[in-house]
Design a protein with these regions (language model features):
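A helix-centric hydrophobic-segment signal that preferentially recognizes long
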Residues: 2-186
Length: 186
């Protein structure tokens, strides 16, 4: 066997490895996109639930206008957010506003006993659980993707083909705000 054939064989093997690595990165990137779309579906359902929740609360706690306005503003910001980082930050604000809205039920026993409010609160809780599961799946997909672009041989050409690190969907610094127990004044 001549040296030319050996060199050609090595080049073919390297090209095949490169194609395989590239295709793996494409698949991982698509998985991240699908996972974010799954989060988006859950968030849209939550956004669609909020007007009904506000209308129900408004009937019992009309003078809590500030809290209701905060929820509406946070919902609008969340609906217009783009990209995982921006969406996560906006959704954190919305979660905090919703926590304060739900806490109003403690100050209004008639609201707390309202069947429609209870149903909406249950639906919201279910959606929060689905969002948390979707977020975990998304973050797992991002972790696999980010690891994939840093591993050899993909690390050699990932940047050249536009594969860059992706952001996690993380509660981050505003996590404490979301987890804070709202104070209800009587």
């Amino acid at each position: 066997m001549s040296t030319g054939w050996i060199v050609l064989g090595v080049i073919v093997i390297l090209v095949l490895f490169a194609f395989g690595a590239y295709n793996r990165l494409v698949a991982l990137s698509q998985r991240v996109g699908q996972a974010f779309a799954d989060i988006d579906v859950q968030l849209k359902q939550r956004h669609d639930l909020i007007p009904n929740l506000i209308e129900t609360v408004k009937g019992y706690a009309a003078h809590e206008r500030g809290t209701l306005d905060d929820v509406v503003k946070a919902r609008n910001a969340a609906m217009s957010a783009q990209g995982p980082g921006q969406v996560a930050a906006a959704e954190n604000q919305l979660s905090g506003a919703l926590s304060r809205l739900i806490a109003l039920s403690e100050a209004y026993p008639d609201l707390k006993a309202n069947a429609n409010f209870q149903q909406l609160q249950s639906e919201l809780s279910d959606l929060e659980n689905k969002i948390a599961a979707s977020r975990r799946f998304f973050n797992n997909a991002v972790q696999e993707y980010n690891t994939g672009i840093q591993q050899m041989p993909a690390a050699l050409f990932a940047g050249a083909f536009g594969f860059t690190r992706k952001e996690f969907f993380d509660l981050g610094a505003s996590r404490t705000e979301v987890e804070q127990v709202p104070t209800v004044k009587f």
